[in-house]
A protein has these predicted regions:
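Domain-level recognition of nuclease-like catalytic cores that cleave nucleotide substrates
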Residues: 1-3, 108-144
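Acidic-basic catalytic patches of nuclease active cores, encompassing PD-(D/E)XK
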Residues: 1-50
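Conserved catalytic cores of phosphodiester-cleaving nucleases, focusing on short active-site segments
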Residues: 40, 59-85, 89, 97
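Hydrophobic residues on conserved beta-strands that form the core of alpha/beta folds
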Residues: 47-49, 71, 127
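Charged, terminal alpha-helix-loop-beta segments
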Residues: 50-51, 64
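A short beta-turn/loop motif at secondary-structure boundaries
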Residues: 52-55, 119-121
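Short acidic/glycine-enriched loop/turn segments that link adjacent beta-strands
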Residues: 55-57, 134-135
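Short, charged, amphipathic alpha-helix that recurs within catalytic cores of restriction-modification
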Residues: 88-119
Length: 144
C-alpha cells in the first residue's frame, strides 16, 4: 500500500475514533445530568431548566425549592484516572456560571421568557456542583 493510502486510512480511523469518543462523552454527560436531576427531584426540588444556554455560558441544571434558586454544574468522568472532576470547575468557569445565572434571572423575569418561573420569588441563589464518576454521584452544595 502506498504511503498516502495509509495516511488516509489513519486519518479516517482517527476521525471515527474521535466521533465515537464524542458520542460516548455526550451520552456520559446526559446520564450524569439525568442522575443529578433525579437527585434534586428526590430532595423535593423542581427542575426549572436543563442545559440552558446564552452567549455568556450554559447552566446544566437549574432547580428551585423553598425560595432558593439552585444552579448546578455537573461534571462526569468514566473513572477517576484523570483526577477529581470538581477540579475542572476553574475560577474562569465560576465566572461564566455567575454571568450566565445573571442572564437566566433576567430572562425569567421578562414577559417573553419561555421558562415558567416558580411560584413566588427566590430569596437566595445557591451554586452547587455535582460529580459523577462511573455511576457514583457526589453532590456539593453551596460551593461558590
Amino acid at each position: 500500500a502506498s504511503r498516502s493510502h495509509l495516511a488516509r486510512a489513519n486519518n479516517v480511523r482517527t476521525a471515527r475514533s474521535r466521533a465515537t469518543r464524542a458520542r460516548a462523552n455526550g451520552a456520559r454527560a446526559r446520564f450524569a445530568e439525568d442522575l443529578v436531576a433525579a437527585w434534586y427531584v428526590r430532595e423535593g426540588y423542581d427542575i426549572i431548566a436543563r442545559n440552558w444556554r446564552c452567549p455568556r455560558g450554559e447552566l446544566d441544571i437549574v432547580a428551585w425549592r423553598d425560595g432558593v434558586l439552585v444552579v448546578c454544574e455537573v461534571k462526569a468522568r468514566r473513572n477517576a484516572d484523570f483526577g477529581d472532576p470538581f477540579e475542572a470547575i476553574t475560577p474562569r468557569k465560576v465566572l461564566r456560571l455567575r454571568r450566565a445565572t445573571a442572564a437566566f434571572v433576567a430572562e425569567v423575569g421578562s414577559a417573553t421568557s419561555s421558562i415558567t418561573p416558580p411560584s413566588g420569588r427566590w430569596q437566595e441563589i445557591r451554586f452547587d456542583a455535582a460529580a459523577v464518576v462511573g455511576t457514583r454521584l457526589t453532590m456539593r452544595e453551596g460551593v461558590f
